[in-house]
From Swiss-Prot:
In-chain residues carrying the UniProt-annotated modification N-acetylmethionine: M1
Residue ranges of domain SWIB/MDM2 in the record: 378-462
Sequence segments annotated as region (Disordered): 222-250
GO MF annotation list: RNA binding; translation initiation factor activity
PUA domain boundaries: 93-173
Subcellular location: Cytoplasm
Record-linked SMART domains: PUA (SM00359)
UniProt-listed Pfam families: Pre-PUA (PF17832), SUI1 (PF01253), WH_eIF2D (PF25304)
Identification of the protein by name: Eukaryotic translation initiation factor 2D
Main function: Translation initiation factor that is able to deliver tRNA to the P-site of the eukaryotic ribosome in a GTP-independent manner. The binding of Met-tRNA(I) occurs after the AUG codon finds its position in the P-site of 40S ribosomes, the situation that takes place during initiation complex formation on some specific RNAs. Its activity in tRNA binding with 40S subunits does not require the presence of the aminoacyl moiety. Possesses the unique ability to deliver non-Met (elongator) tRNAs into the P-site of the 40S subunit.
């Protein structure tokens, strides 16, 4: 969660009532702490700050800081200790042990896989799925990571210590640790415990005897040396090794079997959630590019060539044999899906995968937090010509107002100066200031009254346009002028080829290169990012062909941008016409 830099929203001293509440919460969440220890962790008079921040994936986190070090953090109303706290209270949480080489992966945001656990003679601590746990390294009981158990101890042993063991939230050397004094873990000797009797059913659970023996015989240096001698660096990275950090937890299956399973998952997910009856007939290439790719789980990449089917057409033929879909060649060489049986048991029984909010991928190309559109609010700046009108309310040249504030001020000004027509309440008499501010020169001797709507409209027209952009988790940004819409155009290239050009993505917090990569996958067309001509420090995205339909769907439906901020959507190809 803190593998990358976070953004601080606020940092305030804690109130007395909040301090008492925090102390009560700590006592409830960590019952092993005595009263004196709780008071020591959450001091009564010493400085204690509440820091509200946003993690790099957008999670809102509250951090409690004492003595310059983060001691606790709160996520989704759950309280977690930091490594600084665990170094003072190493027995606060059930602690699992792993190899020192794994720490680097944990700091990078990876979860801890079960093959990376070191099983002590006393067996593994007894935990349930979802329990808060600590992770320490071989030879030192000082925890270096905090996480949540992905399964119970019994399930871990039943799985043969394979799969994901812990979702890691915070670790030594991550950015939360860096916000403190950056001290190193203390040296705490491991406890010398004898293996318990399983019949007692208490404390810890012993692992398989053969597994324990094998784990005890392994030393980190010997295994690392052996793997380095036998495998290339790229192969060694893929191998779980002592760290047990697999990119794919389904290590018991071949790559081809995994890809077959992923292909069917994306196919069923797309039919259940993305494809609609109105989309039929649907080009098979569109099914793959616009629907199946977007349903691929985070951290995984769909590659049909690595599956047993090798080609999309062969896979769809198999799905047609199962009577899930019906495929026809509506035009020569081009296949389309013409019917879908949405009542088919495989579709109705398909469970949409829900990714864990704390799950991370150790792949370099892992996705960032989902895009959230900014809140865009029109504003108005007071120009020199309108200063006389607004100075009564304390505004001066350059002051920024919302439309509702302008309306309220004009109404109050008219009433305060007795300008509302006594015979017709819908009319406002114009005093010298209003005449100078909102009337044209040729009107100043002829127009003496205006209706309310005309008065307010003219006033807004005379003010200078501005706007406020607020991105989630960031402070509002005010800029003068009108925000430029996302501009979509078609350009004619050599050989009568068309390209779709998109500009001004940056103004809405969109990364042009990320958008280009997404469109390349969705449209199955080449994309390039180039400098926008005539626009300093701005770039444009070019997509081969008329891809405005795909682009509009991406901007409107997935990114949820208002249509009024996008121009050029009307140039999308009409249904039935060749792009």
């Amino acid at each position: 969660m803190f593998a990358k830099a976070f953004r601080v929203k606020s940092n305030t001293a804690i109130k007395g009532s909040d301090r008492r509440k925090l102390r009560a919460d700590v006592a409830a969440v960590f019952p092993t702490l005595g009263t004196d220890q709780v008071s020591e962790l959450v001091p009564g008079k010493e400085e204690l700050n509440i820091v509200k921040l946003y993690a790099h994936r957008g999670d809102a986190v509250t951090v409690y800081v004492s003595g310059g070090n983060p001691i606790l953090f709160e996520l989704e109303k759950n309280l977690y200790p930091t490594v600084y706290t665990l170094w003072s209270y190493p027995d606060l949480l059930p602690t699992f042990t792993t190899w020192p080489l794994v720490l680097e992966k944990l700091v990078g945001g990876a979860d801890l896989m079960l093959p990376g656990l070191v099983v002590p003679p006393a067996g593994l601590p007894q935990v349930q799925k979802g329990d808060l746990c600590a992770v320490a390294l071989v030879g030192n009981r000082a925890p270096v990571a905090v996480g949540v158990a992905a399964m119970s101890t019994a399930e871990m042993l039943a799985s043969g210590l394979k799969g994901r063991g812990f979702c890691v939230l915070h670790s030594y050397q991550d950015h939360l640790w860096r916000s403190g004094d950056k001290s190193s873990p203390p040296s705490i000797a491991p406890l010398a415990l004898n293996p318990p009797d399983l019949s007692e059913g208490k404390g810890c659970v012993k692992a398989d005897t053969a597994l324990q023996g094998a784990m005890r015989q392994l030393t980190l240096e010997e295994e690392v040396q052996q793997r380095c001698e036998e495998k290339s660096p790229s192969e060694a990275t893929e191998d779980p090794g002592p760290g047990g950090l697999h990119v794919d937890p389904m290590d018991s299956k071949t790559l081809q079997e995994q890809m077959d399973e992923l292909l069917q998952t994306c196919f069923l997910h797309a039919l259940k959630c993305s494809v609609r009856k109105a989309d039929l007939p649907l080009l098979t290439s569109t099914l793959l590019g616009s629907h199946m790719f977007s349903c691929c789980p985070e951290g995984r990449q769909l590659d049909i060539k690595k599956s047993s089917y090798k080609k999309l057409s062969k896979f769809l033929q198999h799905m047609q044999q199962e009577q899930i879909i019906q495929v026809q060649e509506l035009s020569k060489g081009v296949e389309s899906i013409v019917a879908v049986d949405w009542k088919h048991p495989r579709i109705t029984s398909f469970v949409i995968p829900e990714p864990s909010p704390t799950s991370q991928t150790i792949q370099e190309g892992s996705r960032e937090q989902p895009y959230h559109p900014p809140d865009i609010k029109p504003l108005y700046c007071v120009p020199a010509s309108m200063t006389l009108l607004f100075q009564e309310s304390g505004h001066k040249k350059g002051s920024v107002l919302e439309g509702s504030e302008v309306r309220t001020f004009v109404i109050n000004y008219a009433k305060k100066n007795d300008l509302v027509d006594a015979d017709n309440k819908n009319l406002v008499k114009l005093d010298p200031i209003l005449c100078d501010c909102i009337l044209e020169k040729d009107e100043q001797h002829t127009v003496t009254k205006l209706p309310w709507d005309s008065l307010l409209g003219r006033c807004l027209e005379k003010l200078q346009p501005a706007y406020q952009v607020t991105f989630p988790g960031q402070e509002p940004i005010v800029k003068k002028g009108r925000i430029c819409p996302i501009d979509i155009t078609l350009a004619q290239k050599a050989s009568n080829k068309k390209v779709t050009v998109v500009r001004n993505l940056e103004a809405y917090g969109l990364d042009p290169r990320s958008v280009a990569a997404t469109l390349q996958q969705r449209c199955q067309a080449s994309t390039t990012v180039t400098s926008a001509p005539g626009l300093k420090d701005s770039v444009q995205v070019q997509i081969q062909g008329n891809q405005i339909h795909h682009l509009g769907r991406l901007l409107l439906e997935e990114y949820r941008l208002p249509r009024k901020h996008i121009q050029g959507l009307e140039k999308a190809p009409k249904p039935g016409k060749k792009k």
